[in-house]
């Protein structure tokens, strides 16, 4: 049953985006409780954009198959994003306690990238993403994560937005495998960096 739940979560997360914001749209500004290396803080998109482009990546849930891969790939490539002048923030419907663990976990975020809590799904919805509560009759609330713990919340679509300092969406990446999502995001910020330079 555990494997079936994880498989369903990965399947739904790989589906194409429903009606996500597109290139040229204004990215909704947000502040959210977040964690970096297990330490809580308030993440502000407006503040992050003052330093350069921001990769805002929505993922279904910490400690699930595809999300673990995606966080790990962002962490191991974090210096490449920084070299292109971009920062990265993950957003999920996980509570902050779960994100404190995930952000510090050396296998996943590895203390390199912040993850923000969107517990009610309001940020995801503002980016025109679906918040999914069940798939084929199985509730995300009762699915188990890779540690055997109940996920306990709904899930946002796996979609990544590249937001430029002027607050516009430069790219929307969805409907691809977690590792490909990260590589496409890196390509997008590197292209932005080349245009700027």
Residue ranges and their predicted role:
Residues 1-8:
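Bacterial N-terminal signal peptides that target proteins for export
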Residues 18-197:
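Chalcogenol-based redox active-site neighborhoods
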């Amino acid at each position: 049953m555990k494997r079936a739940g994880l498989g369903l979560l990965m399947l739904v997360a790989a589906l194409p985006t429903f009606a996500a914001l597109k290139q040229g749209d204004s990215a909704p500004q947000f502040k959210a409780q977040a964690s970096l290396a297990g330490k809580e803080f308030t993440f502000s998109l407006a503040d992050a954009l003052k330093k350069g482009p921001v990769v805002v990546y929505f993922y279904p849930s910490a400690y699930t198959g595809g999300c673990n891969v995606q966080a790990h790939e962002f962490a191991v490539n974090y210096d490449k994003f920084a070299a292109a002048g971009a920062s990265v923030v993950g957003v999920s419907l996980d509570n902050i306690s779960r994100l404190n663990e995930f952000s510090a976990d050396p296998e996943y975020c590895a203390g390199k990238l912040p993850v923000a809590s969107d517990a009610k799904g309001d940020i995801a919805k503002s980016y025109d993403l679906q918040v999914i509560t069940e798939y084929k009759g199985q509730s995300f609330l009762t699915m188990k994560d890779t540690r055997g713990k109940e996920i306990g919340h709904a899930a946002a679509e796996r979609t990544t937005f590249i937001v430029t300092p002027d607050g516009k969406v430069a790219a929307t990446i969805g409907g691809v495998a977690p590792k490909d999502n990260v590589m496409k995001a890196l390509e997008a910020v590197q292209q932005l960096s080349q245009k700027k330079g």
